[in-house]
């Protein structure tokens, strides 16, 4: 049996990032062959990752990188199972490297990034025991591009025609805080308006009961107008100065808001409801078998 030295274990730890005992065990199984140990550990990591793939990853981080000339930016979301992992250096490093690759290669879709980062993802899953996924990315290019990050959970990129980076950042901060659904009322679909009308009628059934049709129609129009103002970025009062609408703020600076992208960690992902009492009971039962 080949002798497993401390130097061999140290080298394997540095190359894989895994624990000392796990590295020593892998070296022993590989007969002291470091390259074989790495291959075996990668294979084991893939198996672990496959087992973790069904676990819902609804926490994680949003990251943004902007070009030095403020002409382009990339925003990505990488998910983990817990917010605890999202705050750890290993996860942060994976996110940063993924963002850098997406930015440098001018990727516009997550698919090629997911493929390119799969080996690193498997290694992270094997090391942390949590499912990790690169969920989405958007690249924005334009005249003036600005961004704002609220911690690691909300990120916004704003594209302006005219204006300056500081204005773009201010508007991005507003988008992070106010969460507009559309750029302007003209972008609101008939489907969204119909849904809002349906909700209004359902919630106010008692108030409108017995009222003339024209009165009800005016009530609906009022609600739709309010909805359009609340949901449209250009119609919202600017968070730093509520006396000015965001659209007017841009115009005063000689700018036009072309588009915005807002990411929030886990939005749209259905989170699992955990019954901790049942989970503990199951673990206790397992120890008695």
From Swiss-Prot:
PROSITE patterns: EF_TS_1, EF_TS_2. GO terms for molecular function: translation elongation factor activity. The keyword Nucleus does not apply. SUPFAM superfamilies: Elongation factor Ts (EF-Ts), dimerisation domain, UBA-like. Keywords: Cytoplasm, Elongation factor, Protein biosynthesis. GO terms for cellular component: cytoplasm. The keyword Ligase does not apply. It comes from the Bacteria. Gene3D superfamilies: 1.10.286.20, DNA helicase RuvA subunit, C-terminal domain (1.10.8.10), Elongation factor Ts, dimerisation domain (3.30.479.20). It is found in: Cytoplasm. Residues 82-85 are annotated as: Involved in Mg(2+) ion dislocation from EF-Tu. Disulfide bonds: none annotated. GO terms for biological process: translational elongation. Belongs to the EF-Ts family. Associates with the EF-Tu.GDP complex and induces the exchange of GDP to GTP. It remains bound to the aminoacyl-tRNA.EF-Tu.GTP complex up to the GTP hydrolysis stage on the ribosome. HAMAP family: EF_Ts. This is Elongation factor Ts. It comes from Pseudomonas aeruginosa (strain ATCC 15692 / DSM 22644 / CIP 104116 / JCM 14847 / LMG 12228 / 1C / PRS 101 / PAO1).
